[in-house]
Regions:
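Membrane-embedded catalytic interface detector for glycan/lipid assembly enzymes
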Residues: 12-21, 97-234, 245-263
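Hydrophobic alpha-helical segments
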Residues: 336-433, 438, 443
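Small-residue-enriched transmembrane helix-hairpin modules in multi-pass membrane proteins
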Residues: 151-161, 249-366
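Membrane-interface helix-loop-helix junctions at transmembrane boundaries of multi-pass membrane enzymes
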Residues: 42-47, 180-196, 372-384
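N-terminal "leader" segments that precede or initiate the main folded domain
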Residues: 1-108, 193-197, 203, 219-259, ...
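Hydrophobic alpha-helical transmembrane segments
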Residues: 1, 20-35, 65-73, 113-119, 196-198, 217, 239-240, 357-358, ...
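Hydrophobic, aromatic-rich transmembrane alpha-helices
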Residues: 30-39, 173-186, 358-373
Length: 444
């Protein structure tokens, strides 16, 4: 942490002197060092504090490079908020580790998880069916499928029916559940394995037809993170293969969304106009979110005291339709087309620097207990909880995950699957003849 604070101070001074490239590189180096520190201690590739350190601090370093004309020197309050966001998380995690230690139960024994095979398989069927049926209803009611629409710019933005669309995008959980199923089942039933592969294909087809790059990446990343959480490692060749397969799909969806190179370069306003799009697009999807936070800090007239962060409550209960004023707050961004923001945007919107610090401390506390939990997990669906939080921390530079109703819907759906699998597995653990009969009646 001392090294980080030194690097942070150096980056701040370099930014004030206008030496942007060095300001960014210092923070990127600090992010790598922080990740390596936790990885060497734990051997966990997706250790939650390590992941957050690498991507939050590293993302800030990328933003400090100031490669776009949309970038500007940050205010002192912005620098304080970014420091509080990381310092609160890291400090609370460190405090809890010193008070309680990071041990958390016995190592995983695969034979203990075999009783979860059948409920896991049925969970995949239910979610896949719900997603496909919901997609079909939306397509029928709205009268179009985004992939096949040419004369409707940004068709993906209009392809949703309130409430129902949550079930449509729930398909992103299926690949991760199939990873759990494959590792638990261990190839004992080839027909079910083939069926699981078909369900994976269907669950990936939905975001492709919706031309949603985000949902596609989310589905694949959750599956990869779940595999790493369960196996503790992954071969580099597998990761390279996944990336190679994802690139053409990403390009296809970008074209289908009507985002050609000329359009994107016009929005990004890069200082070097000849910079290739495969560099400028990921750069802007990281860097501009920090710039948007700075816009919020400099332009926000007053705080909203929790209303922004409670948006999932207003959305999932339908209150936003009854009281529109609950969600009628402007978005402060560098450009209207670039609306993605960091994880801490709404925390500052609600309570300023204090909100950012409290929120980061809470995330650090939750992450500590999740890391402890994953070491002694007995229900394999617990790995999906861990993977979701790991992914949200990895993409902490990208959006306000916990102010997003879809995030809570995914967590609730995962909780439902957890309980379903827990109840479905109990018959093999000696919970009595009546419960075994109940299980047989439900699962066959």
């Amino acid at each position: 942490m001392i090294v980080y604070l030194i690097c942070y101070a150096a980056s701040f001074l370099l930014e004030r002197l206008g030496i942007y490239w060095l300001s960014g590189l210092v923070l990127i180096g600090a992010a790598i060092a922080l990740y390596v520190y936790d990885y060497r201690r734990t051997g966990n590739l997706i250790h939650l504090r390590a992941v957050f350190s690498l991507f939050w601090v590293g993302g800030q370093g990328v933003a400090c490079l100031k490669l776009s004309n949309l970038s500007s020197p940050w205010s002192g309050m912005t620098w304080l908020c970014f420091l509080a966001a990381f310092g609160g998380f890291w400090g609370v995690y460190e405090l809890m580790e010193r008070l309680q230690g990071e041990s958390g139960g016995q190592s995983l024994r695969w034979f203990r998880l075999q009783s979860y095979e059948r409920p896991l398989f049925f969970s995949m069927i239910i979610i896949t069916a719900a997603s496909v049926v919901s997609f079909a209803i939306e397509a029928a009611v709205l009268g179009f499928i985004p992939m096949f629409v040419e004369d409707m710019p940004h068709a993906y933005s209009y392809f949703h029916i309130s409430g129902l669309h949550y079930f449509t995008v729930s398909c992103v959980l299926v690949p991760a559940l199939s990873v759990i199923y494959f590792l638990v089942e261990r190839g004992r039933n080839e027909r079910k394995l083939a069926a699981a592969v078909v369900m994976d294909g269907g669950s990936l087809l939905v975001p492709i037809l919706c031309v949603s790059r985000f949902q596609l990446i989310l589905a694949v990343a959750l599956a990869v993170f779940t595999f790493i959480a369960m196996e503790k490692k992954i071969k580099p060749g597998i990761l390279i293969g996944i990336v190679v397969c994802m690139i053409p799909l990403y390009v296809l969806l970008t074209v289908a969304r009507g985002h050609d190179v000329e359009y994107l370069n016009g929005i990004f306003e890069m200082k070097n106009r000849s910079m290739p799009i495969f560099i400028t697009q990921p750069y802007m999807y990281i860097a501009n979110n920090y710039e948007n936070f700075n816009c919020l800090v400099e332009q926000l007239p007053s705080h909203t005291f929790g209303l922004r962060s409670l948006f999932p409550l207003w959305a999932l209960t339908g209150l936003k339709f009854i009281f529109p004023s609950l969600v009628s707050f402007p978005l402060y961004v560098t450009k209207t087309e670039l609306t993605t923001v960091t994880l801490f945007y709404d925390a500052f919107y609600d309570f300023g620097l204090f909100g950012v610090l409290v929120f980061s401390c809470l995330l650090g506390l939750i992450s500590f207990y999740l890391v402890r939990m994953i070491k002694g997990v007995h229900n394999p669906v617990g790995y999906l909880f861990y993977s979701q939080v790991a992914l949200y921390l990895m993409l902490s530079f990208f959006t306000t995950w916990f102010s997003n109703p879809a995030t809570w819907f995914y967590l609730a759906a995962t909780g439902a699957v957890y309980l379903f699998c827990e109840l479905g597995s109990r018959g093999t653990h000696g919970y009595g003849r009546r419960r075994r009969r109940w299980k047989k009646r439900i699962f066959g």
